[in-house]
Regions:
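GH16 jelly-roll
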Residues: 1-159
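Accessible peptide chain termini
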Residues: 1, 185-186
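Solvent-exposed, low-complexity, repeat-rich "mucin-like" stalks and linkers
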Residues: 159-185
Length: 186
């Protein structure tokens, strides 16, 4: 694959933007340096990876009773052009209006990919320990929907997005180097 992707359509992390609807850094049964199984974070990432301000915490929500591991919970995002509202169990826990932030508008007023993963350890979370066997990450369902305004904004984005023309199937034969972009224009 030719690596010359239009910068209008692709970029590396965090320039491309990342919306974390739910992040949890667990601790067994107690609050450990601000980390526990009672607390979740909602975070945006945008800008250069060398920019120390590429992460913006939108909110932190702590369960009033119990821990998140006790039952299923609903984590959500109501995402409209220039605004996001994050919710936990149908309660809005944080929001951001980024209508005056050009970098956020460039990152977040466009489609994003959805990814659900269980990550352990790292710079933020610290050492995950040695007892990771048998861990579970259970998801009951995922729902995606749009209201009329969100549909209109999506349609406007795609109408103005760069179009790729001339795409075609290519047969790869060992020893040959085909021009993968032959006849392709934007």
């Amino acid at each position: 694959l030719d690596g010359r992707i239009s910068s209008e359509q692709g970029a590396s992390w965090p320039v491309c933007g990342e919306i974390d609807i739910m992040e949890m850094i667990g601790a067994e049964n107690e609050d450990l340096n601000g980390k526990s199984n009672k607390k979740v974070y909602q975070t945006l990432h945008a800008g250069s990876a060398t920019d120390v301000d590429h992460s913006k915490s939108i909110s932190t929500y702590t369960l009033p009773e119990g821990i998140f591991n006790d039952d299923y919970h609903i984590f959500g995002l109501n995402w409209s052009k220039n605004k996001m509202e994050f919710y936990v169990d149908n309660k809005i826990v944080g929001s951001i209006d980024y209508s005056n932030n050009e970098e956020y508008k460039r990152c977040f007023n466009r489609p994003q990919y959805i990814q659900m993963n269980l990550a352990t350890g790292g710079n933020w979370a610290g050492d995950a320990g040695d007892n990771l066997a048998g861990q579970k990450y259970e998801i009951d369902y995922v729902y995606y929907g749009q209201n009329a305004q969100q549909k209109a904004d999506s349609k406007e984005y795609y109408e103005n997005a760069i179009k790729i023309n001339g795409e075609h199937d290519v047969t790869m034969t060992e020893g040959e180097t085909p021009n993968l972009l032959e006849g392709v224009t934007s």
